[in-house]
A protein has these predicted regions:
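Hydrophobic transmembrane alpha-helices of multi-pass solute/ion transporters
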Residues: 2-82, 95, 99-103, 278-360, ...
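Long, contiguous bundles of hydrophobic transmembrane helices that form the permeation core
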Residues: 2-18, 50, 192-343, 461-462, ...
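Hydrophobic alpha-helical transmembrane segments
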Residues: 15-19, 37-40, 74, 107-115, ...
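Hydrophobic core segments of alpha-helical transmembrane domains in multi-pass membrane transport
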Residues: 17-29, 40-49, 79-82, 116-121, ...
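Short helix-coil transition sites and intra-membrane helix breaks within transmembrane domains
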Residues: 31-35, 70-73, 84-94, 121-133, ...
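Hydrophobic alpha-helical transmembrane segments of multi-pass integral membrane proteins
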Residues: 76-80, 103-140, 355-368, 382-423
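Interfacial loop-to-transmembrane junctions
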Residues: 100, 104, 348, 458-479
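Alpha-helical transmembrane segments of multi-pass membrane proteins
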Residues: 107-120, 147-164, 190-195, 199, ...
């Protein structure tokens, strides 16, 4: 709608409705209320204040948008959670952590924690599964090296939820999959820029953590704790406040960590790594070799939703990769999975609440974007100086920060403005792959604010508080990612995507 035909009163009420609903959503979500109820209520509140038909927005805007998100991405949530639970119960994640501990040792404790977390999450293991396994490993290493316990959350965050989530090409993280239907890209979009961004994040994060370790040593500050991680992991998983925040920000319900049966007979490092390697290799083969060679013209038919291979191929590739890895994992570890049905049930169940929670956030964003006054917000975002890349980065950063969810904020941004950015990319000669990489990295920056579910869960698992550890999480998780984002935008603007 042309904003010039709206009266000042209508514009004012519309903007007030958006802000009031957002404040309501953030405030109650931070207190642990379920977003499944908060999101539709907040959306209806905004619609009512704006003078829009409330029930029509609930059933025709909110629900249709949420259902579209589930239709596009539920297979990835399902397979990702199932794979993560199988990796945990087979002892594979623990075996990788033990190998890192043995090979790198206490004198390289921070590096061991970062590499261990990166290996399992880049291979497709859900973030929360990695938290509950890497935290005890980090506790043992930090205690042996007498490194302050307060640095543990930042070290784990650097390895599990920064570059492996948003920058490394081919990562099966849901955030890396979301732009694919909007831009017709693959998980390997802008691989060179993604690798450079990863180097920036890792280098900056390790530099900061090493600096803090040296300062602590000079001040005679030691570990000063006990094995809080192993003692607090299970209660943290079941705490309702943590659970409600966590399922909005990541694709695994931490409640299901407690279910199933974790094998005490650990596989070898090679066996444990095989499924992770298969995820990356199969994903690459599908997106680079197989899918480009198949005839998928039939997808344009009404029967298949009048879509295209460019819109669905990236998701197909990740789905096949995770499926191949799951089959291989079960075959390699069958005797270590005596309660296979319980493990599979727990993994499948772990995907439901997160996908519904993020879908509800997406539905909320769709209602906000459908309000007439949103045209003002849209014009402001698109009018930000620096071109489409800067505008896209700012929009995604803000929405990820406000929702406390990288996937939710990213989807809301692309639902509202994705087609516009694609048109601007064609106008400015920007490769859609560059849009993809900028959007994904942007989603993983300001999402790590204090109310983010992953931050809350990580601190609980490590037995730390915001006061003790959040500053270092900000430095390695937010500042490092923002620095990498600036590098990618500058390089992409100068030399394009590569």
């Amino acid at each position: 709608m042309d904003v010039t035909i709206l009266s000042p009163l209508a514009v004012g009420l519309g903007l007030f409705g958006m802000l009031a609903s957002l404040a309501f959503l953030i405030g109650f979500a931070y207190r642990g209320w379920t977003v499944l109820l908060l999101a539709p209520f907040a959306a209806m509140l905004a619609a009512a204040i704006s003078g829009e038909p409330v029930l029509a927005h609930w059933t025709q805007t909110f629900m249709i948008s949420a259902a579209r998100f589930l239709a596009q991405f539920f297979p990835l949530f399902l397979l990702g959670a199932l794979f993560g639970k199988l990796m945990e119960d087979s002892g594979s994640v623990k075996a990788i952590a033990a190998y890192m501990t043995e090979k790198l040792g206490a004198h390289r404790a921070i590096l061991a924690v970062v590499i261990g977390g990166a290996l399992v999450t880049y291979g497709g293991v859900s973030l929360f599964v990695a938290f509950f396994v890497i935290a005890p490993m980090a506790t043992a290493l930090f205690q042996a090296a007498n490194i302050p316990r307060r640095l543990m959350p930042a070290a784990i965050a650097l390895g599990t939820s920064t570059f492996t989530m948003s920058a490394l090409p081919g990562t099966p993280a849901i955030q890396n999959a979301i732009p694919m239907p909007f831009f017709g890209t693959t998980p390997f979009a802008a691989p060179g820029l993604g690798i450079i961004a990863s180097i920036v994040m890792v280098g900056f994060g390790l530099w900061w953590l090493s600096l803090q370790q040296s300062r602590a040593k000079a001040a005679n500050e030691g570990f000063d704790g006990f094995d809080t991680a192993t003692k607090s992991a299970k209660p943290a998983a079941s705490a309702n406040l943590v659970r409600e925040r966590a399922t909005v920000s990541q694709s695994f319900d931490p409640e299901e960590v407690q279910r199933g049966h974790i094998s005490e007979d650990l596989p070898s490092f090679g066996v444990a790594m095989t499924p992770l390697v298969l995820v990356v290799l199969t994903n690459f083969v599908m997106n680079v070799i197989v899918l480009p060679r198949i005839d998928a013209d039939y997808l344009a038919d009404v029967r298949w939703g009048e879509t295209s291979l460019a819109a669905v191929g990236g998701v197909w590739g990740v789905c096949v990769a995770l499926t191949v890895a799951i089959v291989a994992l079960v075959l390699l570890n069958r005797r270590r999975l005596p309660a296979l049905r319980e493990t599979i049930d727990a993994g499948a169940n772990a995907s439901v609440l997160p996908v519904l929670s993020v879908g509800s956030l997406v539905g909320y964003g769709a209602v906000i974007a459908a309000l007439p006054a949103f045209a003002i917000v849209r014009e402001w975002v698109l009018g930000i100086g620096g071109g489409p890349l800067v505008s896209l980065a700012v929009a995604t950063n803000l929405l990820a920060a406000l929702t406390g969810s990288a996937s939710g904020g990213l989807t809301i941004a692309l639902d509202a403005l994705g087609s516009t950015y694609l048109q601007l990319a064609a106008q400015y000669g920007i490769d859609p792959a560059l849009l993809h990489r900028v959007a994904v990295i942007s989603s993983g920056t300001l999402d790590s604010l204090p109310h983010n579910g992953a931050v809350v869960t990580l601190l609980a698992v490590c037995g730390s508080t915001h006061r003790e550890s959040y500053r270092d999480i900000v430095i390695v998780g937010i500042l490092g990612a923002l620095l990498a984002l600036v590098v990618v935008i500058v390089l992409g603007s100068i030399v394009g995507s590569f």
